[in-house]
């Protein structure tokens, strides 16, 4: 056998067996390149914004509409200030904060930013106050007992709504509740209109003193309270936070006694003296009567239980206690024995005061001003009107008796 032929057959290589089919070569030529590795999905803008907002403590939402730069808000947050902290700060404290920001971070605030920060804080305060007012409005419009209880704890609340609800429940009427709510809303609208009238009157008077404004406002409020009930002379009823107690008796339960009520008037006198001392130190005009300034000072001092509606509501009861303590104590014992509520006792306090005014020429203002503890209080308009009415009745009775020649008329004190 030829060795060359053997080696040639052994090492013979057929290139056609090693080459791929033409179709596969074409597929390999046109095949797309492998895709790049997948990137992580982009973070949503809302999520990123919420993270930034959390880092700034809500300052970006507070400042974004007032031209404050993002870096400025970020540095304020870095100093540890939050929205709630800024809302509770005074203007002087805000100025100190902005000065500290400039000194610590060497960051010069623009003039518009300084004003914008204060404007944003004022706008946020107004928004929160409006939300609080709307919340209270919804609370009242619900007509629930809890809302009335909350108002009675604060001071005084209107009782006709509660009385109408009781009548509606007693009569079994299902649709009258909405009418009660509408009536309550109408009363609030009337009160707002009255406040606008009082404010307009102050602007017209111009140079009138603060105490004259207080006295005028007090008289107008009393007039409206008297004439609210269908134009009659019956006074608006209220939910009273007190109960009738005898002298020296300590009240039990949630409500306080009458000794506590009279003690509140003594506290008001102390607060007035403090306000007068502060005014003298500052060289300002000193108030001579218990005005809104005194009530605001009492609230700042922590005596939030002393408020203007409550103290003005019972001032004639305190006047009877000061002018004739024996008659006041006898009236308290009589109403306590009969189980009467404090509203009936309050109405009964008018008659002895009118009798005292009758013995002193019907001049109830002079009687108040002559007493050291009553001189700081305004005379209730209803008490003044009752004295005027009884004086007219007495004069008419005297004139008729002199004309007819008959006997003199008796005591014509009206029933309160």
Curated annotation (Swiss-Prot):
<dbReference type="Pfam" id="PF01698">
    <property type="entry name" value="SAM_LFY"/>
</dbReference>
<feature type="site" description="Interaction with DNA">
    <location>
        <position position="285"/>
    </location>
</feature>
<keyword id="KW-0539">Nucleus</keyword>
<feature type="DNA-binding region">
    <location>
        <begin position="378"/>
        <end position="381"/>
    </location>
</feature>
<feature type="DNA-binding region">
    <location>
        <begin position="307"/>
        <end position="314"/>
    </location>
</feature>
<keyword id="KW-0217">Developmental protein</keyword>
<dbReference type="InterPro" id="IPR035079">
    <property type="entry name" value="LFY_SAM"/>
</dbReference>
<dbReference type="GO" id="GO:0005634">
    <property type="term" value="C:nucleus"/>
</dbReference>
<keyword id="KW-0805">Transcription regulation</keyword>
<feature type="site" description="Interaction with DNA">
    <location>
        <position position="296"/>
    </location>
</feature>
<feature type="site" description="Interaction with DNA">
    <location>
        <position position="343"/>
    </location>
</feature>
<protein>
    <recommendedName>
        <fullName>Floricaula/leafy homolog 2</fullName>
    </recommendedName>
</protein>
<keyword id="KW-0804">Transcription</keyword>
<feature type="region of interest" description="Disordered">
    <location>
        <begin position="154"/>
        <end position="237"/>
    </location>
</feature>
<dbReference type="InterPro" id="IPR035209">
    <property type="entry name" value="FLO/LFY_C"/>
</dbReference>
<comment type="function">
    <text>Probable transcription factor that act to specify determinacy in the progenitor cells for both flowers and leaves.</text>
</comment>
<dbReference type="GO" id="GO:0006355">
    <property type="term" value="P:regulation of DNA-templated transcription"/>
</dbReference>
<keyword id="KW-0238">DNA-binding</keyword>
<dbReference type="GO" id="GO:0003677">
    <property type="term" value="F:DNA binding"/>
</dbReference>
<dbReference type="InterPro" id="IPR002910">
    <property type="entry name" value="FLO_LFY"/>
</dbReference>
<feature type="DNA-binding region">
    <location>
        <begin position="238"/>
        <end position="242"/>
    </location>
</feature>
<dbReference type="InterPro" id="IPR038276">
    <property type="entry name" value="Floricaula/leafy_C_sf"/>
</dbReference>
<feature type="site" description="Interaction with DNA">
    <location>
        <position position="292"/>
    </location>
</feature>
<keyword id="KW-0010">Activator</keyword>
<dbReference type="Pfam" id="PF17538">
    <property type="entry name" value="C_LFY_FLO"/>
</dbReference>
<comment type="similarity">
    <text>Belongs to the FLO/LFY family.</text>
</comment>
<feature type="compositionally biased region" description="Acidic residues">
    <location>
        <begin position="210"/>
        <end position="225"/>
    </location>
</feature>
